C-alpha cells in the first residue's frame, strides 16, 4: 500500500507544528520563543513521526511539559529557560548533540531574536578543552568499568549480563568517538553513519560496533563478547594515543599511565 508522499507529510506536519506553536503562545503569552527539533525541523518526517517542540522562557518558573495528539500526530511540548539553553554550551553530555540539533532547528516564534542569537552562536562554537577532557575521561572510565561487567558475564555464562555490558560499552565508545572527532550529532537517525565514518576510530569498528550494540543480531554470545572486548581495547588505546598528551588533570593523566595489558585490556 502506497503511503503519503514526502511533500504531503511535510505539509501535514508543518501545519500541526504551527497549530502547536499557536496554542503554546495563547496559553503562555510570555514565552521568549518557540522552536521545533527533529525530523519535522529537517523537513523529513515519516508517517509515524512525532513533533518535538520546545518553548523558551525568560522567567525562572517554567510551565509544565505536556503532550497530546493532533489527529494521528503526537506532539510533545517541553520548556527551557534561556539560561538552561545557554548552559548546554558548557555541558559535556549535551554539547555535541545540542550543537548538531541547532544546525537543523526550526524557529517558529522569536519576537526579540533570542533564539536566532543562540542558534548563530552554536554554529560558531567549538568544544572547550574542559568539555573534551571531561567527556573523554568519563568514557574512558565507563568503558573500563563495563569491561569488567562484560568479563564477569562471560565467565559466569550469564548471557544477559554479557550482552547488556556489550551494548553499554558500544554506547560509551560512540561518545568517545564523538568527542575525539568533534562531531555535531544531528539526530539518532544519522548517528550510526556519523560514527562509522569518523576519521579517528577503532580499527575494527565496522565489525565490532554493530555486534556489541546489538543491531547486528547473532545467537552466538561469544561473537558479541569478543567484539565488545576488542572494542574496549581499541577505544581505550585510541583515547590514550589521540588525547593522552593533552590531558591537564593529574588524576586522568595517572589513569592513562596505567598499563591496560596489566588488567586484561
Indicate where each model-derived feature is located.
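Short N-terminal helix-initiation segments at or just after the protein's N-terminus
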Residues: 1, 14-21, 42, 108-116, ...
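Metal-dependent nucleotidyltransferase catalytic core
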Residues: 1-49, 54-103
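Acidic-enriched, low-complexity/disordered segments with a strong bias for Aspartate over Glutamate
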Residues: 14, 50-52, 65, 70-72, ...
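Short amphipathic alpha-helical segments, especially helix-boundary/capping motifs
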Residues: 16, 29, 40, 121-127, ...
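Surface-exposed beta-strand edges and their flanking turn/coil or helix-capping segments
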Residues: 49, 68, 89-93, 122-123, ...
